[in-house]
Amino acid sequence: QGNSIPSLTAALREERLRNAALLMLRPGAFPEVCGRVCPSMRLCESVCPIPADLGGPVPIAALERFAADYLLDGGWDPWPLASNGKRVAIVGAGPSGLACADVLARQGVNVTVFERDSEIGGLLTFGIPSFKLEHALISHRRRMLERLGICFRLSTAVGRDISIKNLLQNFDAIFIGIGAEFPVTPNLPGLDGHGVVWARPW
C-alpha cells in the first residue's frame, strides 16, 4: 500500500491532525511501526525534490509516526462492520498476517490467528530491539485488533497443535503468512566457527 504523502503533509500543515492520522491508519497499515523502522532515508526521502538548503528532505517517516501516535495515544479504535458470517484462519501473526487480519476484520470477517510463539508480531517482536521499536506498540496493536473481534491462538503451531485439515474443515479460507523464519546463509568459510552468532538468537 502506498501512502499519499502530499495529502498527509497538507493535513498536518493545516493542523487537521485527526485527518492526517486517518490517512495513515487505513486497514492493513501500521504507521506506528513503519514510521519507526522503515529505512525512509534510502526510499521515499531519498527522492524528495526539496533540497537540503531549503530544509529538505521532508522527514516522511517522522510525520507518519507523529500522525499515528497522535490518534493511537488518544485511544482511537477502528470500527468493524457487522459480521458477514465468513470465517478465515490466518497462520502466522507477523506483519503480513496482522495486516490481513486487520483488513478482513474491518470488512466483517470472523478472523482467528494461529501463532506458534507466545506473542504476536513475528520479527517486529522477536527480531527488532526495543530501542528501535518499543514492544509496547505491538501490545497496543494487539489490543486494538482484539477489540475488532480478532481471536489470537498463541503458542499454537499449525501442523503440531492443530492440523491444516482441521482448519480446512472449520474455516472458509486460510491465509498463510509464516514469514522469513530462516536467515539467508552466506557462502563464506568459518560460519560454524567460534564467535559466529546469528542475528535473531542474539
Question: Where does each model-flagged region fall?
Answer:
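Alpha-helix boundary recognition
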Residues: 25, 39, 146, 168-169
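Beta1-alpha1 glycine-rich phosphate/pyrophosphate-binding loop at the start
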Residues: 2-14, 24-25, 56-61, 90-158, ...
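Residue-level marker of structural boundaries
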Residues: 17, 29-30, 72, 129, ...
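Short hydrophobic/aromatic-rich motifs at helix boundaries and adjacent loops
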Residues: 16-19, 72-74, 112-114
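Immediate flanking context of iron-sulfur cluster ligation sites
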Residues: 18-43
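FAD-binding core/adjacent interface of flavoenzyme oxidoreductases
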Residues: 8, 33-34, 42-91, 150-202
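Short amphipathic alpha-helical surface patches that mediate protein-protein
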Residues: 13, 25-29, 39, 53, ...
